Amino acid sequence: MAERSLAGGKLQVRELRGDAVTIGPEHVEAQESTVTAIDIALEPDETMIGKAKAANATLLQNFPKGFSLDATHHPHVSIFAGFVPTADLPKVYAEADKILAKENYTAWKLTALKYYYIPLGPIGLGGIVVKPTPDLLRLQRELIDAVGPFTVKTATAAAFYTTPTEPDIHPSVIDYIAAFMPDHSGKNFSPHVTIGVGTTAFLDAMLAEPFTDFTFSPASASVYQFGDFGAARNRLKVFAPKR
C-alpha cells in the first residue's frame, strides 16, 4: 500500500489489492470560460469498459450519491492534464493530433493491475491501476512537450464542466491538474481508469478482495473538459485512430 498526500497538489493514493466508447461529434465547445481544464485521454476498449462499469455499479450500491460511468462520465486513461486558455484550444487540438496520428495505440496491450483509491474525507475516488509502458510514457512526454507551452499555472472552478445539479469542483482536483506535469508524469505517472466514488470504509473492505490482472487496448483518443473528481465530462475533440 502506498500513500502520498493530496494537499498542495500531491496525490494521496491507497492501493487496493484485489480481485464501446460511443464517439460523439468530432468537436464541441467548452463551457464558456477564459481557461479550460483539459484531459487528453485514451479511451479503452469494451474489455476495460465492462470491468469499470461493473465496479462502478458496485460502488453506487454503497454510495448512491456518486456518479455513474455514462455519456458524461467516460472511462478513460488520462495521459495529459492541464489548464489551457480557451482561445488556444484549436492549437492544442492541432498539436495533439500530430502526435496521436503517428501512434498505433489501438494495437497496444495494456495491463490492469489492481484497484486504488484517493481518500477525500469520508469518501474515496476509486480506480483501476494500469501498468505504465514505454509507449504510454513516450506518448505522455511528447504531449507534454507539444501542449505544455500552452498551459497556465492554475485556474478556478469556472474552467471545469459543471451542471446546475453538480456545480462544485473539489479544490484538490484543481490542485491535482495544476501539478500534473511536474508531479504525475514520467517516473511518477500512474495511469488508471477511474471507476467511481465509495465510502472509505467500503473501499477499505475491498483490500481483501482478489484482483485478477487483465489486458485491454485503447480504442480511441479524445480531449475532454474535466469535471469534478477528474471525470471526463465534456468531449471537446475526437481523434481518428491510425489505420
Segments predicted by a language model, with ranges:
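N-terminal amphipathic/basic-hydrophobic helices that include classical n-h-c signal peptides
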Residues: M1-E29
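Basic, often amphipathic N-terminal segments
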Residues: I23-L120, T133-S222, F226-D228, A232-R243
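Short histidine-centered catalytic/ligand-binding loop motif
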Residues: G127-P132
